[in-house]
UniProtKB/Swiss-Prot annotation:
Pfam families, per database record: Mito_carr (PF00153)
GO molecular function: NAD transmembrane transporter activity
InterPro entries, sorted: Mitochondrial_sb/sol_carrier, Mt_carrier_dom_sf, SLC25A32-like
Family assignment from sequence similarity: Belongs to the mitochondrial carrier (TC 2.A.29) family.
Parts of the chain that traverse the membrane: 9-29, 73-93, 137-157, 253-273, 290-310, 341-362
Keyword Coiled coil: no
Compartment(s) of residence: Mitochondrion inner membrane
Record-given protein name: Uncharacterized mitochondrial carrier C227.03c
Solcar repeat ranges per the UniProt record: 3-98, 131-276, 284-369
Entry keyword set: Membrane, Mitochondrion, Mitochondrion inner membrane, Repeat, Transmembrane, Transmembrane helix, Transport
Source organism of this protein record: Schizosaccharomyces pombe (strain 972 / ATCC 24843) (Fission yeast)
Amino acid sequence: MVDDSLKDAIAGGAAGLASSLVVAPLDVVKTRKQAQKAFYSTGGGKNTMVLGGTLSSMRTIFHNEGIAGLYRGVGPMMLGYLPSWSIYFVVYEKCKVLFGVNKKYTSLHEIDSSKVGIKASLDSSDKQFYRYWGGQIFSAVIAGAASVTLTNPIWVVKTRLVTQSHPRASSFVDKIAAATTVQFRNLQTDAPSVKWRMPRFWLKRRTNVKSSPSQHPVNPPTGPACSPAYNNTFDAFRKIYKYEGLAAFYRGLFPSLFGTLHVGIQFPLYEYFKSFLDDFFGKKSNFHIVLAATLSKIAASTVTYPHEVLRTRLQSLDAPTHNSATLLIRDIWRSEGWRKYYSGMATNFIRTIPASSVTFLSFEIVRKWLN
């Protein structure tokens, strides 16, 4: 007899794996739009790649980097989604029991629609109604916190791989030894590029760097802006640890923990919508799962999307001046406006809605099959 926790782990891992493969190209576009200023080039903007809409961005990346560019970071993405969802669903189900959620509600596929749908909403005095919603929300938040804390290093590596642009020429050494002006890419169509003059103390450090086309600089300065180009997932892990230390793997953890509010909204709403639809139509259907996942994802993303922008910028390759989430929030507000907190949101919806549907549908199907 397979333990329920193991079933949840297997089903969650399968769900994460399926969703990562389906939406990898859209995730690359979304991450690059969010990272915006993390993209840089040297040599007077020769390598500047301006991204517009979702489809045009995919064409641009494909033209400049090939099919590999659209699937850049898919290795750590798969490596991240599999344990993330495995950990999440295991902790989620355990927490629901811990918080006293009725046995009828202890798993996604066993919800009693007569207690959760319209009838539960109308009977707001019912203690079971409050226990259900409170248990669901706290369980979702705790499971999210456990998942992001344990897997944050993987997402840092994934973000670094995705946000480093790979024109077919130019190496890391060339970029380190090149001109003294770094040109950040502005990913808005028709918007001019923004140039940033590097500080004097940094220029002095750059002039002392010795390099050759075949090796990395001797005693390079540390920090995400100076990290070498990464050849693959394991190379990224090694170089980040070597040049930046263990703490770099937890860059952006605070915004990620704030993002647990996302699942705190999404999961209770998903279970509510799914049960409501089953109750309304008098039968269970995979279509109800997809629709419930879509509606809950839209609601949760609209409320919590800014944290994803903050997390991506903190984790990105070239964000040396933003080591604090508070400072980054202030800087974005002052220099770019509040709209930048929702940069790439349209692309995010195109990516996350199918991903959410695939994740929940895969989980429900695999979990039912394991039973």
